[in-house]
Amino acid sequence: AAPGLSHAAAKYTLRFAHDGAPDAVYSLTYVKFKELAEQKTGGKVKIKLFDNAVLGGDRVVTESTQRGDLEMGGCGTSNLGIFWPSAMAFDLPFVIDPAKKAALYDSLNNGRLGEYLNEHLAKVNLMALVYADCSNRHYATSKKPIKDLASLKGVKMRTTASPVDNLLAETLRMTPAPMGFAEVYTVLQQGTVDGELISLSDIKT
């Protein structure tokens, strides 16, 4: 902590909720944000983090932020499309060249693309502070290995709320089961779904 920071009375306390585990890749981004915000304001601003969906999943947290009931929340682009349909462009398969991903995030966080998105998000009472990469998502199953596209036929796959994700699952002859990330572990244990659409970093956590 900066000198005197631990003794300074916070003038503003901002609650930041998300559905990730504390050690998820994007969660570490939020921890760093908290550290810098408190440091740069000399302790006048305190960021209180709520992880593991204790205040709700992406949709609930974003709706709460939109209404002003919550100061900040983390939301994946797959759920952001519920509030601003154009955000679904990020869910299209192969739309982002991996070799240009760094340039994309630079434009999102520091350039014209981020400014453009915020101009439109403002119309639905939202504003993006930062875009974090949580790695590409993959199909994973708990009942049988995925050896080829034929292996996916008939699999009941947990997907996000994104219409793009669900249409892709149907195109691959799976049965999509859209649900929030916070529900995934339980439904896999219960056998309600056969697999999940998830990033490798989230599988690890």
Tell where the protein language model's regions lie, with residue ranges.
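Extracytoplasmic small-molecule ligand-binding "clamshell" domains
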Residues: 32, 46-65, 98
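Pocket-lining segment of extracytoplasmic ligand-binding domains
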Residues: 79, 164-166, 174-205
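Immediate post-signal peptide segment of exported/extracytoplasmic ligand-binding proteins
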Residues: 2-18, 38-46, 122, 144-156, ...
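Short beta-strand-to-loop elements that line the ligand-binding cleft
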Residues: 47-56, 158-159, 174-187
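Contiguous mixed-secondary-structure segments that line small-molecule binding/active-site clefts
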Residues: 34-38, 66, 76-175, 187
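Soluble non-cytosolic domains of exported or imported proteins
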Residues: 24-28, 55-59, 111, 159, ...
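Alpha-to-beta junction loops
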Residues: 43-45, 61-75, 173-176, 190-198
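Extracytoplasmic "Venus flytrap"
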Residues: 15-32, 52-57, 203
